[in-house]
Amino acid sequence: MNQIEIFFQFYAYFLLLISYFIGSIPFGLLFTRFAKLGDVRTIGSGNIGTTNVLRTGNKKIAALTLLCDTLKGTIVIWIAKFLIYPIDNNIISVLAGFFAFWGHLFPIWLKFKGGKGVATYLGVCLGLFWPAVIVFTIIWIISFLFKRLSSLSALVAVTAVPIFVYLFSPCFYTNCTIAIMSVLVIIKHHANIRRLLIGKERKVTIKKRNG
């Protein structure tokens, strides 16, 4: 291994650390506070993700949260793909996406109490195998139109996506990573699953804003 390869190897490790910190940024909490909507953790489900931000009644802030939480997973993958050279950037880009996803689930800034990871999951899928995002979106929309339950829609979609990726993605690392992330998303929805089983899961409602 020459000096250039050693340099890029250390650079790759540094990128993984940065990916985690980027993933840890709680955009939902930051945006709702900036918009003076209060602490999103005290609203609805108490989650910092898009669905709960939407419950504040501010659709623009919810959309911005969705965008930024998604891009967390995509940007780090793009950086790894185009800047990690000459070492194998395929495995590094996959790991960068996973570290960003892990950071969203367990953010250091919030004492490791983060979101459920759906938006960042989509961002990682976008960076690794973009057709998976289309499959997720179609399944989510169909499920939501029938039940109006965001959590159920997400659970159905993340269950189907790994199967699709396994069938059509040529990358072993991508297949494994998306499958692991799907399991983690399901685990993070454990409270939602319990409520779904007893018929007490909250449907998506938007808080009316005064004025």
Swiss-Prot record:
Keyword hit for Transmembrane helix: yes
GO cellular component: plasma membrane
InterPro entries referenced in this protein's UniProt entry, alphabetically: G3P_acylTferase_PlsY (IPR003811)
Any one Pfam family match given in the protein's UniProt record, by short name: G3P_acyltransf
Assigned EC number: 2.3.1.275
Subunit annotation: Probably interacts with PlsX.
Name the UniProt record assigns to this protein: Glycerol-3-phosphate acyltransferase
Gene label: plsY
